Amino acid sequence: MKNFVIPSIDLLDGKIVRLLKGDYNKATIYEVKVDDLVEKYNAFSNLHIVNLNGAKGEKCEKNEKIIAEIRKKFKGKIQVGGGIRNIEKIEFYLNKVNIDAVVLGTLCIKNVEKTVEIIKKFGAEKIVLAIDCENVNDVFVPKINGWQEFCDCKNIFDLLEKYNGIAKKLLITDIQRDGCLSGGNCDLYQQIKTKFPSFQVQASGGISTIDDIKKLQEVTDFAIVGRAMYENNLLETIAISAP
């Protein structure tokens, strides 16, 4: 389970937080030292970090400094997302900070052609496509710019078709479940894996219990866990589990 679960650290204004359904006005701040958290997370193979300021187009040097410090202390692989929309920022994280993979969200939804070029330049192992979607009349519609707005693409499956055979890693978030501790959307992930079996899928949103994680193990490749790590004491339980 330690190899399946990817702990998440969300940074806003230099602080560790969790949002509720992507709402920046509903941020819970966790009074925990980054060093202490990273020490605990070293029990896991992977780590997911989000620069929430970057996700909504804001600069925050505090966040980038924290990410660089985490890289020095975390022993496993790290992926970073939030506002990564150009080659310069990708090279900064991959080459200067030595991050293992970058997560592209808004860019991969708004500009497929440019994203494909990036995948070919850096390799599919280095690029994670993050598609955050919301259920609108039983159709999962991608949202962009830190979940603040919808885009022209009206169906996640139409978007995935464009990357089929090109991209390898997906991070799929059901926004309505994010931060709610209501369980992952197994049905959505099952549909994606059935239609596009070549994608490596990371599930995100709503994961709150060990049972949630076990259910997701049947339909996805990884599960990103954020709020439940802090509030449901999952960290200790998973950390002592079998890989």
What are these language model-derived features?
Residues L12-K26, I99-D178:
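Conserved anion-binding
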Residues F4-S8, N46-H48, K77-Q79, D100-V103, ...:
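Structural preference for beta-strand elements that scaffold enzyme active sites
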Residues N46-K65, T173-L181:
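Glycine-rich, proline-tolerant flexible connector loops at the mouths of alpha/beta enzymes
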Residues D23-Y41:
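Short catalytic helix/loop segments, enriched in acidic residues and glycine
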Residues E58-Q79, K120-A130, G183-T209:
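Alpha-helix-loop-beta-strand connector modules within alpha/beta enzyme cores
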